[in-house]
Design a protein with these regions (language model features):
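Catalytic-domain carbohydrate-binding cleft regions of carbohydrate-active enzymes
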Residues: 1, 7-346
Length: 346
């Protein structure tokens, strides 16, 4: 959004940075391309057939009233679709949505439309303000960005991708004071510090203000099966040192959403390095037709008896709309001893 209070005649200069596509083509079955891009294997510009083209650019006039009305109505419609149609809540939401359709008139002039949008929101307000009961689960939602440091693009693009992601999140933290964002990988932070020092200073301020959560314990988000115990300890040594020196944070949580495996030595290694918690989730994605993992919240006991408190969401790319949240809860593996759920979205 260029402006939420634009004045007629104002001119804007737009600078656009784009990435023209991955070096590797899509797989024959249409799935994700393979990687990573090895040093020296990347041709810039890409040869014909592997080059993407920006073909269409559009713009529109932002109407905050219309957007908020759409959000309200869509939220209630998604909730309604998931409810027992015989429930009182379903009846109340259906009534509110009907009243909304009677209040809104899209055929009026601009002033009339805006007035009707606001009347429509008032019609939906009672249903949106209804309180949940005492047996409703709690979701702890936090923004995150899982940045692959080396996958389908050259390292130079990782630098730019990191900068774009961090800058966008800082803007969101300013726009939404209640928003919290978590970011792992000191390796990514170090790229930012080296190539975008002013941006890095803004991140440090956001960490100090409690808006940006600098956590993760390890230097990167590594595989834990191929790496030796010494390599994993080094990950923790350098990772925790960086968090402490740059952000004043004693990192106590291993944030490992996208690893492909877990060594049985991990609880012992984490405990010995002062890490108390583990968050991961790929076990729900890559089970190769095996039996579904039965828990989300549990103690993982290592070979030496060390215990790590662990929480496994089923994704790190959740949406935050009602249908997603209700679906996450209904499809959870652990049906008992669980009344709250971590929801990393982004």
């Amino acid at each position: 959004v260029l402006s939420t209070a634009a004045v007629a005649g104002t001119e804007y200069e737009i600078l656009m940075e784009t990435y023209a596509g991955h070096y590797y083509p899509e797989s024959p079955d249409g799935g994700c391309a393979t990687g990573p891009v090895l040093p020296g294997s990347y041709q810039d510009p890409l040869e014909e057939g592997r080059r993407r083209t920006l073909g269409v650019c559009t713009f529109g006039i932002w109407n905050e009233d219309a957007y908020q009305l759409w959000m309200d109505a869509d939220t209630l419609k998604q909730v309604l679709d998931k409810l027992d149609p015989n429930s009182l809540r379903a009846a109340k939401i259906a009534e509110a949505l009907e009243n909304f359709t009677l209040a809104v008139d899209f055929e009026q002039d601009e002033a009339g439309r805006i007035a009707s949008y606001r009347a429509g929101r008032e019609a939906l307000k009672p249903a949106l303000e209804a309180k949940n009961g005492s047996t409703t689960p709690v979701f702890y939602a936090v923004g995150n960005a899982h940045i692959d440091l080396a996958w389908l693009w050259p390292m130079a693009e990782t630098h730019r991708k990191t900068e774009r992601t961090f800058a966008a999140q800082l803007r969101l933290l300013e726009e939404y004071p209640e928003y919290k964002y978590i970011q792992s990988q000191p390796a990514a932070y170090e790229m930012c510090r080296k190539y975008y020092p002013e941006l890095f200073q803004r991140i440090k301020e956001a960490v100090k203000d409690g808006k940006w959560i600098a956590e993760g314990a390890m230097w990167v988000e590594p595989d834990t099966n191929m790496a030796s115990g010494e390599a994993l300890i080094r990950q923790l040594l350098y990772g925790k040192k960086y968090y402490k020196e740059e952000f004043g944070v004693d990192s106590q949580m291993l944030w490992l959403p996208d690893t492909f495996g877990y060594t049985a030595a991990l609880p012992q290694i984490l405990k010995s390095c002062g890490v108390k918690y583990l968050v991961t989730q790929k076990i729900f994605w890559s089970y190769n037709e095996g039996e579904q993992f039965p828990y989300h919240y549990f103690y993982w006991e290592g070979m030496d008896g060390s215990k790590i408190t662990s929480f496994l969401p089923t994704s790190y790319t959740y949406r935050t709309d009602p249908s997603e949240l209700i679906g996450v809860w209904e499809n959870r593996s652990q049906k008992r001893d669980l009344d709250a759920f971590l929801l990393p979205f982004g």
